[in-house]
Swiss-Prot record:
The keyword Ribosomal protein applies. PANTHER family: 60S RIBOSOMAL PROTEIN L21 (PTHR20981). One of its GO terms (cellular component) is ribonucleoprotein complex. Transmembrane segments: none annotated. HAMAP family: Ribosomal_eL21. InterPro entries: Ribosomal_eL21, Ribosomal_eL21_arc, Ribosomal_eL21_CS, Ribosomal_eL21_sf, Translation_prot_SH3-like_sf. The gene is rpl21e. One of its GO terms (molecular function) is structural constituent of ribosome. PROSITE patterns: RIBOSOMAL_L21E. This is Large ribosomal subunit protein eL21. GO terms for biological process: translation. Keywords: Ribonucleoprotein, Ribosomal protein. It comes from the Archaea. The lineage of its organism: Archaea, Methanobacteriati, Methanobacteriota, Stenosarchaea group, Methanomicrobia. Belongs to the eukaryotic ribosomal protein eL21 family.
Length: 97
């Protein structure tokens, strides 16, 4: 059997909640708002598949560049390149200074 090349390959532990985090996500995560230029961390919520960024960006930090519908456009550094990542607010968390 050949290896799969799907979007969620190699994410067995990356997209897994701990025992205490299991269940429905709080509504406050869905209605949180961010401003342009704000720094946020990508923290994928595996219980919500819609608007999920690519798992390779899990744990990375980016700057909010704009909004597209309910989703936010982030600018994230990947190596030497700057990438644009589109994500729903459920998968983002504000950076604390």
């Amino acid at each position: 059997m050949t290896n799969s090349h799907g979007e969620k390959r190699c994410t067995r532990y990356k997209l897994q909640k701990t025992v205490r985090e299991r269940g429905i996500s709080p509504v406050s995560k869905a209605i949180q708002e961010f401003e342009e230029g704000q720094m946020v961390h990508i923290d994928i919520d595996p219980s919500i598949q819609k608007g999920m960024p690519n798992p390779k960006f899990q744990g990375s930090t980016g700057k909010i560049v704009g909004q597209r519908g309910r989703s936010y456009i982030l600018e994230v550094r990947s190596g030497n390149a700057m990438k644009e990542v589109i994500s729903l607010p459920q998968h983002l968390k504000p950076q604390k200074y």
